[in-house]
Amino acid sequence: MAMNKLNFLLLLAVCVSAFSVVMQQNQYRLNFTALDKAKKQEIALEQDYAQMRLQQARLANHEAIRAAAEKQNLHPPVSGNTFMVEHQR
C-alpha cells in the first residue's frame, strides 16, 4: 500500500514537472515571437527614419528651394509690396 502511494506521488511529480516544462517552452516561443516582431518593426522604423532624413536633406537644399520658387514664380518681397496690419481694439 505504501508503494502505491509513493508511485502515485512520483507520477504526480513527473506530470507536474512535464506540464511545467511544456508551459516554459510555450512561454519561450511566445517571447521569441514577440522579440522577432519587435526587431522587424525596429528595422522598418529605422528605414523610415533614414528615408525621412534624406527627404529633409533634399528639401533643405538651397538649390531645390530656389528651383521650387522659380517654378511657382515667387519673388522676394520688396518694400512696395509689403504692408503692416495692425490690430484695433
UniProtKB/Swiss-Prot annotation:
Localization per Swiss-Prot or TrEMBL: Cell inner membrane
Entry's Gene Ontology BP terms: FtsZ-dependent cytokinesis
Transmembrane segments annotated in the record for this chain: 7-24
Entry GO terms, CC: cell division site; plasma membrane
UniProt keyword annotation of Cell membrane present: yes
Family of the protein in this entry: Belongs to the FtsL family.
Protein's recorded name: Cell division protein FtsL
Organism of derivation: Neisseria meningitidis serogroup B (strain ATCC BAA-335 / MC58)
